[in-house]
UniProtKB/Swiss-Prot annotation:
GO terms for biological process: folic acid-containing compound biosynthetic process; tetrahydrofolate interconversion. It comes from the Bacteria. Belongs to the 5-formyltetrahydrofolate cyclo-ligase family. ATP binds at R9, K10, E11, I12, R13, G142, M143, G144, G145, G146, F147, Y148, D149, D181. This is Uncharacterized protein BUsg_396. It comes from Buchnera aphidicola subsp. Schizaphis graminum (strain Sg).
């Protein structure tokens, strides 16, 4: 990605979303299966038990192959629930092959749930996080809603580890950072596990 383009958050978001939505079905299939192999070469994922993930939206890399692999390896999978656009809060509920899904206010699939199903943050081992772009410092650029920024705030003080998941082309040299932006310690792409030093 050009240096000029990488200087503007809005341009980065727009450009990557266009590229992401232009990925062919064959490429999507290949890349989503490659990232499963990459994920299970990451000891943090391999050894985790309670794993929060997400369902793909807006051209994001397909997470279903990874979720299936997690189930087959006896991992407990959880999906995010968006409480409201006002509070910008996320919480996570179990996702199994028997879960019934519906479209929320953002047209994103999420499970029907009871309040008693919500898992405590302290019981999550890791959270696989969607993103639009990431840079050489691990700075994450999301869709702009702020839900994950809010949930991941001060994640270093919590038990879970956040791990980004993206196509390789979603890496950019530099993202102009805002105070609310989160730096991820790890980002998975089909061809690489990116580790970032946390200051």
């Amino acid at each position: 990605m050009s240096t000029k383009r990488s200087q503007n958050r809005k341009e980065i978001r727009s450009y990557i979303r266009i590229v992401r939505n232009s990925v062919t079905l064959t490429k999507k299939y290949d890349e989503s299966n490659k990232i499963v192999r990459t994920a299970f070469n990451c000891n943090i994922i391999y050894n985790a038990k309670n794993i929060a993930c997400f369902l793909s939206f807006d051209g994001e890399i397909n997470t279903y192959p990874l979720i299936l692999k997690l189930w087959l390896n006896n991992k407990n999978v959880f999906l995010p629930i968006v409480s409201s656009s006002y509070s910008r809060k996320l919480f996570f509920v179990p996702f199994t092959c028997k879960s019934i899904l519906y479209y929320n206010q953002y047209n994103i699939l999420q499970p029907f749930y009871n309040m008693k199903d919500i898992i405590l943050e302290s019981d999550l081992d890791l959270i696989i996080v969607p993103l639009v772009a990431f840079d050489c410092r691990g700075v994450r650029l999301g869709m702009g809603g702020g839900f994950y920024d809010q949930f991941l705030k001060n994640w270093e003080r919590k038990k879970f580890i956040p791990i980004g998941m993206a196509y390789d082309f979603q890496f950019v040299n530099y993202i102009p950072r805002q105070p609310w932006d989160i730096s991820l310690p790890i980002v998975l792409t089909p061809n690489k596990i990116h580790f970032f030093h946390q200051n």
